């Protein structure tokens, strides 16, 4: 069982000073539990990402995706790690490739393969995966992070817009930022997402 704290009130039944026990088998909780495990140190100078929306959907049948970034912060940055998010899938084999000096912003693999790392996730969630060797990226150049998942039935997380009585979230993707590989070619997410 979990020892839980009710942060809303200490005046509910079956609790002691706002704490109560909740069985793992209690049907009042959903089928997923979230635990956050953070690194204690700030290991990276910059974080390149395209932030999402308030809700995530699954793109089934697509195993490869990519993001293209432009190095802007320093004369010569080092890419040391890549994050991937698999909100509901565990034990997923992956291969991550980093390409530098891109020659075509519509093709994430159009540059030089600078790093490749493979592994398997052990739990669902967001993973920070360290590269075997840091990749040097000069200021102003474009680089791509390509992620390939090797487990059938796994869906890629993709944020989408939400609007209801308590929350409104708008999602927008610009061109030449994020890509999906399907039907034998790269497809820009800006053409897939709603604007």
PLM segments and residue spans:
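Beta-sheet-rich sandwich/jelly-roll-like modules and their strand-loop junctions
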Residues: 24-108, 135-142, 148-195
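Short strand-edge motifs at loop-to-beta-strand transitions and within beta-strands
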Residues: 125-127
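A mature extracytoplasmic/lumenal domain signature
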Residues: 6-8, 133, 149
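Catalytic nucleophile-His microenvironment captured as a short glycine-rich beta-strand/loop
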Residues: 1-12
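A short macromolecule-binding patch
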Residues: 11-24
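Solvent-exposed serine/threonine-rich low-complexity stretches and specific carbohydrate-binding patches
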Residues: 108-122
């Amino acid at each position: 069982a979990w020892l839980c704290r009710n942060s809303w009130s200490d005046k509910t039944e079956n609790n002691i000073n706002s704490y109560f026990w909740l069985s793992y088998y209690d049907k009042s909780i959903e089928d997923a539990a979230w635990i956050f495990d953070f690194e204690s140190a700030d290991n990276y100078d910059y974080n390149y990402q395209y932030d999402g929306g308030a809700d995530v959907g699954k793109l089934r049948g697509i195993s490869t995706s990519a993001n293209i970034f432009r190095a802007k912060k320093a004369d010569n940055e080092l890419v040391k790690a890549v994050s991937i998010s698999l909100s509901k899938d565990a034990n997923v084999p992956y291969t991550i490739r980093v390409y530098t000096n891109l020659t075509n912003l519509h093709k994430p693999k159009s540059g030089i393969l600078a790093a490749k790392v493979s592994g398997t996730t052990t739990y669902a969630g967001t993973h920070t995966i360290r590269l075997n060797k840091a990749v040097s990226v000069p200021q102003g150049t474009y680089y791509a992070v390509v992620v390939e998942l090797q487990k059938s039935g796994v869906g890629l997380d993709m944020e989408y817009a939400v609007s209801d009585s308590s929350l409104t979230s708008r999602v927008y993707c610009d061109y030449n930022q994020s890509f999906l590989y399907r039907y034998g070619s790269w497809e820009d997410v800006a053409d897939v997402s709603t604007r």
